[in-house]
A protein has these predicted regions:
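Short, Lys/Arg-rich flexible segments
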Residues: 1-97, 104-106, 114, 118-167
Length: 167
């Protein structure tokens, strides 16, 4: 019968014990935040690529003449308000982060005297309305960066684990 002897098993066991006592929630939160960054960057790039109306103001759209562009001020509002929200943990223990729009732009209307809500404008552009042709800039950016986001999260988790094992 052959005999195999392993050395260093105690060290490995200690490292596994350290890993089991590590701040797993903190590791996950850092990874999720890092995974959101490429998505946010891609959405900002997609906003920069949106077509702006030549006149500087948005004409009224209709079912026959669908809007396909936005105003310069709407675009600026989207770029300025785009960001990553703080990490949240829901009641089921899932750790989430939202990438999206906050606040209002400078286009004041009778309906929106404080300015148009940036989230409303983004949703209208992305999904379309009865008078605006949809331009799926958010959906495309998210799909385009999915693998990059997962890779960033994996790298973050692996770096945290490596740090524990190198102590």
């Amino acid at each position: 019968m052959a005999k195999i002897t392993f050395t260093g098993g105690d060290d490995f066991g200690e490292k596994l014990a350290q890993l089991s006592h590590a701040d797993a929630r903190g590791m996950i939160k850092r990874a999720v935040k890092r995974g959101a960054a490429p998505v946010a960057d891609a959405i900002k790039e997609a906003i920069r690529a949106l077509v702006v109306t030549e006149e500087g103001y948005e004409r009224h759209g209709s079912e026959r003449h669908m809007l396909t562009s936005i105003t310069k001020r709407q675009k600026e509002g989207l770029l300025e308000s785009m960001g990553i929200a703080s990490i949240r943990e829901d009641k089921n223990g899932f750790i989430n982060v939202k990438v999206g729009f906050d606040g209002y732009n400078t286009v004041k209307t009778k309906k929106f005297p404080q300015g148009q809500p940036n989230a409303l404008i983004a949703r209208a552009i992305n999904s379309g309305t009865s008078f605006r042709k949809k331009t799926r800039f958010i959906d495309k950016a998210v799909k385009k960066t999915e693998a990059q986001s997962i890779k960033a999260m994996n790298e973050s988790i692996n770096a945290d684990i490596r740090e524990i094992f190198e102590k």
